[in-house]
Amino acid sequence: FTYAKNLMYDEESALFYRDGKYIYPKHKTNQGLKDFWSRGNGWVFAGLAKVLQDLPENDVHRAEYITIYKAMAKSLAAAQQEEGYWTRSLLDPVQAPGRETSGTAFFTYGYLWGVNNGLLDKSIYEPVIKQGWKYLTEIALQPNGKIGYVQPIGERADQHKNVGPETTADFGVGAFLLAGSEMVKYLNN
């Protein structure tokens, strides 16, 4: 984690670049901005929640992970779109506009876990959770039971690649189920 963090974590934005090829200013969005991939940051945010869940309280890295997790929570909240989703390029919605479910589900899970476990302030993050969950259950979840608007596998967020209600993938479904499992705990608290 330390190697990846040192290479790809942007302290200013509190987000991770996709990989070493996407680090600013070498790589920029079409608008000249930093490019942070939604699903990739979703894996990190949800991954930190999963690690913190099992990491001993006295682990030497725990405070560092909590600091990054909380900084990401703040940054991601500011990037959430009005409809409740996050765009494929987090800080440049024009780069690849429109709905994206896999990152949104990972973020919603991460926020739910943080509130459920006392690491995130419910009064601050409940609106983010509610908007994310509303998007997941009212827009991403299709009448036939499929989870739509999942960005396909690919190297970058391509504004010319259509992501629609029929676009699905197993990792999007898995992220949706993670969010759902944590929502049950949230509702029971």
Could you tell me what each predicted segment is?
Residues 1-20, 25, 66-84, 127-145:
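Long, well-ordered core segments of solenoidal/helical folds
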Residues 1-8, 46-48, 52-55, 80, ...:
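Sec/Tat-exported extracytoplasmic proteins
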Residues 20-39:
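Acidic/Ser/Thr-rich, low-complexity mid-to-C-terminal regulatory regions of eukaryotic proteins
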Residues 34-37, 59-66, 93-104:
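Short, surface-exposed loop/turn motifs that are enriched in glycine and acidic residues
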Residues 35-50, 105-107, 176:
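Alpha-helical bundle segments that constitute or directly flank the non-heme di-iron/ferroxidase center
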Residues 45-91:
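Oxyanion-binding "anion nests"
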Residues 86, 93, 98-189:
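CBM-like carbohydrate-recognition segments
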